[in-house]
UniProtKB/Swiss-Prot annotation:
Protein's name according to its UniProt entry: A-type ATP synthase subunit A
Disulfide bond sites: none
Family in the record: Belongs to the ATPase alpha/beta chains family.
Lipid metabolism as UniProt keyword: no
Compartments, as annotated in UniProt: Cell membrane
Gene name tied to this protein: atpA
Assigned keywords, A-Z: ATP synthesis, ATP-binding, Cell membrane, Hydrogen ion transport, Ion transport, Membrane, Nucleotide-binding, Translocase, Transport
Protein EC: 7.1.2.2
GO cellular component: plasma membrane; proton-transporting two-sector ATPase complex, catalytic domain
A biological-process GO annotation: proton motive force-driven plasma membrane ATP synthesis
Amino acid sequence: MVSEGRVVRVNGPLVIADGMREAQMFEVVYVSDLKLVGEITRIEGDRAFIQVYESTDGVKPGDKVYRSGAPLSVELGPGLIGKIYDGLQRPLDSIAKVSNSPFVARGVSIPALDRQTKWHFVPKVKSGDKVGPGDIIGVVQETDLIEHRILIPPNVHGTLKELAREGDYTVEDVVAVVDMNGDEIPVKMYQKWPVRIPRPYKEKLEPVEPLLTGIRVLDTVFPIAKGGTAAIPGPFGSGKTVTLQSLAKWSAAKVVIYVGCGERGNEMTDELRSFPKLKDPWTGKPLLLRTILVANTSNMPVAARESSIYVGVTMAEYFRDQGYDVLLVADSTSRWAEALRDLGGRMEEMPAEEGFPSYLPSRLAEYYERAGRVIALGNPERYGSVTIASAVSPPGGDFTEPVTSNTLRFVRVFWPLDVSLAQARHYPAINWIQGFSAYVDLVAQWWHKNVDPNWKEMRDTMMKVLIREDELRQIVRLVGPESLAEKDKLVLEAAKLIKDAFLKQNAYDDIDAFSSPQKQVRIMRLIYIFYNQSQDLISKGVPLKKILDKVGPIEPEIIRIKYTIKNDELNKIDEIENKLKATFDSLLKEVS
């Protein structure tokens, strides 16, 4: 029998209970007769410090605390895709049906996976086979996009004694029995896993394949690889949420998990409304058929922000183990860090910089280190990845504050949003001077092999132009562009073309919202031709004004490509390219 404790003190979401000598760290407990879910975060003697994931209004000293004997865990199995959960993996749609209220009642307990729904199970092995951790024993077609693979749990191995025939089963039905050293272990279609423990894998690999997003600045300027980590810091109103929503909508991931952590509820509502209507550009099916939403909005309990991040990343690892590429989008980790600060203050811990706890960097590291591309456990051999992209909301856009500066230590892609770009209506407002990607050289090989062998050369030329333009900006402010050398005037003209034709992208335009890799390269090639050919002519003594008089009428056509030419109509770009080359050829003939 698991022992009970008693509440001795209540301080907001922190409850202190005694009589908890046998309790363990991170064990789930239920506080008072309301059965409020909490997690033990510190033990001193027989006292346990519990962070409660629901409102503690009405909880008083003397109330009972019931131990569960298990850590905070999630249910992993068929039925996850297309659902919206709260930070404790409680299905919000099921709660709405039961409670008949727009609010989540306290102490409500509904399993994450529907116990009534039947799934069509197709076995992939046979009785008598040797099985080990991660082996696929059968599959369930969960949605049109996702084939859910039923795995042997990581701690089970032995001989398959029984296996269910092909047919319809609920997640509670036993589909296999494994003889493990004489013990019969039942295997159901779902398994439970503690959220704070990373799921095991066979081998971690270097991320070499880009996670294509259809957003030009993210794919070409600062690319992210499958299994990579990225941060999007930016002040209020700079476009973090729209950029993250574009990532969730258009990225080439098989499964997308969107965690709304401490942000406005309207944003999650927007996702729920738009995802069923929008079509996945890679498959043509509704986006909700590959998406899981975890909503822990700003008006929900602060403590559950931490659990929502861990719930999301554990579900991501589960689909990675099935051999899928998963994208985890978290908006925003700053709200989670603020929850840590709040709880740290209530537990009277020594504060570090700006009041955040001293263990903030290690918590961020634990989270980002769960990303990666791996060879999954079990047979058949399969590759999966978890890519993490998180928003950071620094107060006043100060990138030196602790959450942003510590996040920078652990991510390999930095997409900083610049409020001055947002105010100038340049979206996505990613600052091309401050941003960086450590994956450029790794993903270049994929681009060269699958799209264009000159991809890196064109990208690097574009970046050099943008960096040089930034250096010239101060001079132009002081003395005007007329005093510049011809080649520097060309830099300003080329940079303007890069911004207007390539970097700016309208997330709400039907054609421009998603740009295929081929289309991105074709636009970049036109800019590359314009810059290189103009440079050659200037070196031969042709003034820039003369070049622009001839080429000027073609520039608006290059800028309009993103709005007017669809991803499957790239042959129309050939006409513009031929016209551009012919114009430069005629200029060259005039010089020679």
